[in-house]
A protein has these predicted regions:
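Active-site loop-helix segments enriched in His/Asp/Glu that coordinate
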Residues: 1-3, 27-29, 61-68, 141-169
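Acidic, glycine-rich active-site loops and adjacent beta-strand->loop/helix elements
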Residues: 16-18, 56-58, 86, 117-122, ...
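Generic beta-strand/beta-sheet core signal
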Residues: 13, 53-55, 83, 114-118, ...
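Flexible glycine/proline-rich, aromatic-decorated loop/lid segments
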Residues: 6, 123-138, 146-164, 207-231
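Beta-strand segments within the central parallel beta-sheet cores of soluble alpha/beta enzyme folds
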Residues: 82, 110-117, 141-144, 171-183
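Predominant activation on well-ordered alpha-helical scaffold segments within soluble catalytic domains
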Residues: 37-41, 66-70, 95-102, 126-133, ...
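Alpha/beta enzyme core
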Residues: 1-113, 129-136
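A mid-to-C-terminal "edge-of-domain" accessory segment
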Residues: 160-162, 167-297
Length: 297
C-alpha cells in the first residue's frame, strides 16, 4: 500500500458491544481486542494519524471499553472515537462513560477523544455537548443532522450552543465563522434533496420567526425577550416577524411603516378588523395582502 499524505488520517472501526460481538462478528473479547490492535498497528505504519472507533461503544462494558482503548493507544492510535451508534445513551450516561475512560485509561492523555452520536431518541446534540463537558474535543456530525436512520449530530446546533453558552463551555472555542452556517445548510439541503424542517433549530426557516402577538411585541421592544441567539450571527437577515391572525396592532403598524404605507389612526380599527379576517383565512398575511387591505379602506 502507498503511504498517506501528511494531512491524511486512517479511521478504523471495530464493533465492541456484546450484541455486536455475539450476533454480528461471532468473536470473543480477546479476539476483538487483537483485531483492533493489529489493525491500528498496521495503519500506523502507513499514516501519521490513526483514529480508532469502538462501534456501539455506549452499549459496551465500560471495563472492556477501557481495556481496548488502552491497547489501541499503545498500538499507535492518535484519536479515540466513542460512538453512540444507535442513539441509545442519555446525556448523563455519556458524560459518565467519557469520565470513566479518562480516569481508567492510563495513557488517555496521549490522544484526542471524539464522539459520534446518532439521533434515534433525539439526544445526539445533547449527548455531544455532554461529551464536550466531560473533556471530548472532537465532535463528529453532519450539516442539518442528516444521516443514517434518524440522523446524526447537527453540527450547526452544537456550534451555536458552544457559541451562545460560553458560561457552560468556557474552555472551548471552535474557530468557526458562525455567520456562514445558513449557507452550507441550504447547499446540503439542495444537493441531498432533504429539506430542512421549517421548525429546525438554528437553520430552520422559522427559527427566528415570531407569529404570536405577545412574542412579536416583546421582540420589537427587545429581541432578547424571545431570542437567545442573534439571527445575523448565524447568517440569517434580521429577525422575521411574519404577520398572522395572532399578530397584534403594534406589529401591523410596524409592517405598514416598513412598507411605506400610511393609515390614519381613525382607520386603524377597521384595518385591524380586516387584517384579522384575512388571518383567519390563511396562515400568514403577506405584504401584498396588507397593501390590498389598505387600498380597500
Amino acid at each position: 500500500m502507498k503511504a498517506a499524505g501528511e494531512r491524511e488520517r486512517i479511521h478504523l472501526v471495530v464493533a465492541t458491544s456484546p450484541i455486536h460481538r455475539k450476533y454480528k462478528l461471532g468473536k470473543s473479547r480477546e479476539q476483538i481486542r487483537n483485531m483492533a490492535v493489529k489493525s491500528v498497528a498496521m495503519a500506523s505504519d502507513l499514516c501519521g494519524e490513526v483514529q480508532f472507533s469502538a462501534e456501539d461503544a455506549s452499549r459496551t462494558e465500560p471495563e472492556f471499553l477501557a481495556e481496548i482503548v488502552e491497547s489501541v493507544i499503545d498500538a499507535g492510535a492518535a484519536v479515540i472515537n466513542i460512538p453512540d451508534t444507535v442513539g441509545f445513551t442519555m446525556p448523563e450516561e455519556y458524560f459518565r462513560l467519557i469520565s470513566y475512560l479518562k480516569s481508567h485509561v492510563p495513557n488517555v492523555d496521549r490522544v484526542r477523544l471524539s464522539v459520534h452520536c446518532h439521533d434515534d431518541m433525539g439526544m445526539a446534540v445533547a449527548n455531544s455537548l455532554a461529551a464536550i463537558r466531560a473533556g471530548v474535543r472532537q465532535i463528529e456530525g453532519t450539516i442539518n443532522g442528516i444521516g443514517e436512520r434518524a440522523g446524526n449530530t447537527a453540527l450547526e446546533e452544537v456550534i451555536m450552543a458552544l457559541h451562545s453558552r460560553r458560561d457552560f463551555f468556557s474552555e472551548v472555542r471552535t474557530g468557526i465563522r458562525t455567520n456562514e452556517l445558513v449557507r452550507p445548510s441550504r447547499m446540503v439541503a439542495a444537493m441531498s434533496g432533504l429539506a430542512v424542517p421549517r421548525s429546525k433549530a438554528v437553520v430552520g426557516a422559522n427559527a427566528f420567526a415570531h407569529g404570536s402577538g405577545i412574542h412579536q411585541d416583546g421582540v420589537l421592544k427587545n429581541r432578547s425577550t424571545y431570542e437567545v441567539m442573534d439571527p445575523e450571527e448565524i447568517g440569517w437577515g434580521a429577525t422575521e416577524l411574519p404577520l398572522t391572525k395572532h399578530s397584534g396592532r403594534h406589529a401591523v403598524k410596524m409592517r405598514l411603516s416598513a412598507l411605506g404605507l400610511s393609515v390614519p389612526d381613525t382607520d386603524m380599527p377597521r384595518l385591524f378588523e380586516l387584517f384579522k379576517k384575512r388571518g383567519d383565512q390563511c396562515k400568514f398575511v403577506y405584504d401584498d395582502d396588507l397593501a390590498a387591505l389598505v387600498d380597500s379602506l
